[in-house]
Amino acid sequence: MRRSRPRFSPWRQNRPPYQQSYRPHSSQYQQQGQSSDVFDFLNLPESFPSMKQLIDDPILTPIIMERIQQLTPSAADSFALMNFVTRVRQKLEALVLSPHSFTACQISEVRDVGSHKHNTIIIPSIGSQSRLTSDLVVVLKTLPTREAIEQLGNRLKQDLQNEYQPNEEALLSIQSTDYGLSLENGTMAVHLLLTTLPANWHTLDPTIHLDRAMCKRNFNATKHAKWVDEVCIHPSNKVLVRLLKDLRQRFHGLEPLNPWLINLLAHHCVTNNNSTEQLPPSYAFKRALQLLSSGLFLPGSNGLYDPFSDANMHPSRLHTIMTSEEQDRLCYTSQTLLRALAIHPKYVLGIENGPDIFAGPCQLNGVLFVPNEPVVFDNESNGHALNDSQQQSMFVEVNS
């Protein structure tokens, strides 16, 4: 009997389910056009065999561990934030259990999401207005009107002030935002991401209700949080997420990376390789910059697919939400940082200060350093994100 050809190469056949790439079936590639994967030598063991086992980099690993200690909040700050979040959550759950005590809106459930839940929170950069924050998704049974959200904020502020000492009441403030509510208490903040049940989305009016796209985004945050809890459990993943978040807040070119994209990129870099073992933080960090530099999120690239999209019908490539200028800025910024990492790793990771390498030619650790330049500008992208067909046409023009 003729043996059937294995679908995957031998090194991928026994891969655990959580390490599978989130890619649609190969037939989907033909339907989408000439999209392609970026160069990644770790997934090409036949052409680029490893000369040695991937162990921790003796130079980069101590620098990464030192930076992680600087980015991690102190035990006192973490306890204070957890105490503040617990108080807010208790007040919200009280409204869930006794809906008749508050008639402006009815709460269905409250869920923890974000960096504080996943233990990947970092200290805000010096001089920024940011605070240590925790996120809670509040799902309403009723429609999220602006008036109801404001009344919910006033009720929470009143209930919290009843438990505070007189000197603590002045620190508590609450304000309405485009995503819901923000409760601030000195150097800490709790963001309430308001949304409603999916059955109510089609009835939302942007003039009186919270924006429909924002409601969907806040609701999807609960799915993302569950996925991260179940899949991103390796310590290297949490370390890489912290490092990427730190790079994003220090370098303007990495701002297009949102938290969900950072989690997917970190998971891909740590787990998706030619073995069943996870990469150490030093190699995973360099691999993240290498993939971004190779054009992982440029037009025509397969990029990273959303695990919650329908892969059989309409697989969603996450980088298509960016404008072409943002995609180009993300690529050339990563290329510049990757070259700087080889010259002065302590500067890239934030351990030591140095010149602004994106301002122009400079001396970096005794080496003349010239940054990469953009090839797409704002007037060319018009500030609009490109869909898959538009990005495919741009890909064809570049390669023609």
Residue ranges and their predicted role:
Residues 1-132, 138-155, 169-173, 178-182, ...:
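N-terminal regions immediately upstream of nucleotidyltransferase
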Residues 1-3, 12-22, 101, 133, ...:
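Intrinsic structural disorder
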Residues 5, 33-35, 221, 254, ...:
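Generic detection of intrinsically disordered/low-complexity segments and helix-coil linkers/edges
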Residues 9, 30, 40-42, 49, ...:
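Compositionally biased, low-structure terminal segments
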Residues 15, 21-36, 234, 250, ...:
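Compositionally biased, intrinsically disordered low-complexity segments enriched
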Residues 78-81, 85-86, 215-230, 325, ...:
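Charged, low-complexity, helix-prone segments enriched in Lys/Glu/Asp/Gln
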Residues 86, 93, 146-306:
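Catalytic cores of NTP-dependent nucleotidyl/adenyl transfer enzymes across multiple folds
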Residues 259, 263-400:
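Pol beta-like nucleotidyltransferase catalytic core
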